[in-house]
Amino acid sequence: MNQRNASMTVIGAGSYGTALAITLARNGHEVVLWGHDPEHIATLERDRCNAAFLPDVPFPDTLHLESDLATALAASRNILVVVPSHVFGEVLRQIKPLMRPDARLVWATKGLEAETGRLLQDVAREALGDQIPLAVISGPTFAKELAAGLPTAISLASTDQTFADDLQQLLHCGKSFRVYSNPDFIGVQLGGAVKNVIAIGAGMSDGIGFGANARTALITRGLAEMSRLGAALGADPATFMGMAGLGDLVLTCTDNQSRNRRFGMMLGQGMDVQSAQEKIGQVVEGYRNTKEVRELAYRFGVEMPITEEIYQVLYCGKNAREAALTLLGRARKDERSSH
C-alpha cells in the first residue's frame, strides 16, 4: 500500500472499530486501523484477527495495522473515528494537528459529550473548525455480526453531500452491508445516544421479571421520548422511524449482545451499579449517556420520564423496581401527548 492512498483510516481498534475496518477491507478497500495501545496493535498484527472481541474473523490482506498516529492519519483523507463518547473530543484534539489538509471526518461513536450533553457535531466543530466535512453513521450494528458479514443496515448523514456520496459508495456492500443516506444530521446522532439509555431500562425491566409486555411498552414509550427530544433539537421525526432510531432501539433493547441491556438486567436483578459495570468488562455507553441525555432534556424543557427514572437508579441510588413502579404509577394521559 502506498502510504497516502488508503481509502479510510479508522481511529479506534475496539470491537466496533475493528468490525468496520474489516467490512471496509472486505469491500476491496485499503484500510488503516489505528489504536492507542501499541501492544494491542502489535498483537492484532501478529494474530491477524482481534482475538479478544472477534476471534473467528481473520483480517483481510488490505487491512493494515498502525500504532503511529501521524502515519495513520497521513494514509487517507477519510478518517473514521470509533471511540467511546466520553473521549471523543479529546481524540479529535489529538488528531487535529496531524490531519491532512484535505481530511474529511466521519464517526461511528454513539452518545453525547460528557457532562455537557452537547451533540458530537458541536464537539467536532469546536475541535476541528468549520471547514472540514463531517459525517456520522449510526444504526443497529453489533460488531460480531458486522464482522462476520451478516446482513446489516445503517444510516449515514453528513454536512457535505459529496462526502456523503463517497462514504455511501465506500461502505455499501450489496451482499451484506446496506447504507441508507439521510439528510438529518441531528437526528441520526441523537438516536444513537437515547437508545443506549432506553436499553438499560429494558434490561432492568427484564431483570426484574416484568416480561415481554412491559419490555415492549418501554421500547415504545422510549421511542416517544427520543422523538420529543429530537423535535426540540430540530431533527426530522421520520428519522426516528429509521435505522438510527427505531432500528437501533429495538436491537439494543432486545438482544443480550447489548452491553447496555445486560447492564440493566444486572441492576434489575439487584446488583449495584459499580459491580454491574465491572462484570460487563467493557464501556457501557448508556451509563454516561443517561446523565447527558437528561441534561439535554432539561436544557430544552423536554419531559423524559423513563430517562429520569434510569438516572435516579444510576446516580441517586434508587432501586430498579421502585423506579419501574414510579413509571407505572404516573397519571393517566393521552398516548399522543407531549409528556
From Swiss-Prot:
Binding positions (NADPH): S15, Y16, H36, K110, A143, R259, V283, E285
Superkingdom in the source lineage: Bacteria
Localization per Swiss-Prot or TrEMBL: Cytoplasm
Coarse class of the protein's main subcellular location: cytoplasm
Homology family: Belongs to the NAD-dependent glycerol-3-phosphate dehydrogenase family.
UniProt-listed GO biological process terms: carbohydrate metabolic process; glycerol-3-phosphate biosynthetic process; glycerol-3-phosphate catabolic process; glycerophospholipid biosynthetic process
Protein name as annotated: Glycerol-3-phosphate dehydrogenase [NAD(P)+]
Entry-linked Pfam families: NAD_Gly3P_dh_C (PF07479), NAD_Gly3P_dh_N (PF01210)
Active site residues according to the UniProt entry: K195 (proton acceptor)
EC number from the UniProt entry: 1.1.1.94
Originating organism: Escherichia coli (strain ATCC 8739 / DSM 1576 / NBRC 3972 / NCIMB 8545 / WDCM 00012 / Crooks)
Function: Catalyzes the reduction of the glycolytic intermediate dihydroxyacetone phosphate (DHAP) to sn-glycerol 3-phosphate (G3P), the key precursor for phospholipid synthesis.
Cellular component terms (Gene Ontology): cytosol
PANTHER family recorded: GLYCEROL-3-PHOSPHATE DEHYDROGENASE, GLYCEROL-3-PHOSPHATE DEHYDROGENASE [NAD(+)] 2, CHLOROPLASTIC
GO molecular function list: glycerol-3-phosphate dehydrogenase [NAD(P)+] activity; NAD binding
UniProt: sn-glycerol 3-phosphate binding residues: K110, G139, T141, K195, D248, S258, R259, N260
Keyword annotations from UniProtKB, A to Z: Cytoplasm, Lipid biosynthesis, Lipid metabolism, NAD, NADP, Nucleotide-binding, Oxidoreductase, Phospholipid biosynthesis, Phospholipid metabolism
InterPro entries attached to this UniProt entry: 6-PGluconate_DH-like_C_sf, 6PGD_dom2, G3P_DH_NAD-dep, G3P_DH_NAD-dep_C, G3P_DH_NAD-dep_N, NAD(P)-bd_dom_sf
Metabolic or biological pathway: Membrane lipid metabolism; glycerophospholipid metabolism
Catalytic reaction list: sn-glycerol 3-phosphate + NAD(+) = dihydroxyacetone phosphate + NADH + H(+); sn-glycerol 3-phosphate + NADP(+) = dihydroxyacetone phosphate + NADPH + H(+)
